[in-house]
Amino acid sequence: PSQHAPFPLGFRYDYCNTDILTHRLTVSGGLLCTPEGLTYRMLWIPHNQRMLTSTVERIGSLLRQGALVVASAPCSPATLMGGKQGEKAFRQAVERVWGKRHKPGLYRVGKGTLAVGMSIQEALEATRMQPDVQSPDSNLQWLHRRTQDADWYFVAAPPQGTFRGQVRFRCQGIAEEWNPVNGRIWQADVTQADGY
């Protein structure tokens, strides 16, 4: 999807190509992880009618390890290589991952969950996933990164605008505000409620 396409408020996404999917993503504690320490709560594969057999197999592996994947079964392989044998391998891989799971719903696959036939919004609601950031201004710009010791949120006013108000973050602990212009750091005035 386009970076500017409508997306559920309070959530962000990164793009992932087949190389990252195949070689760089692992699953730990139900989260998809990169070697750099980035974590993701969900792998979303929208409207993908064709896939490589290796991609289907990797999705199955991530599911069995505990990932949450939002994807419907692909219809055909993304390559003609392998001829009829390649087609057969593709069909078998799809059967191992999706099997009879074609109706909209949540399905257990190994330790993971497969959300089939759902929009991203429907999958978020079905899994009761809470937004990372809540703000009265839907145009507020933000980015979240987590390290071993802290959650980091970079927050900026909407383009060509200003922001004044409360923002809720899905994390707990002591909060500091850092001014990127002058380097000033101060203790933020925070309250904690409902996981925020």
Q: Residue ranges of each PLM-predicted region?
A:
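Carbohydrate-binding surfaces of carbohydrate-active enzymes
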Residues: 1-196
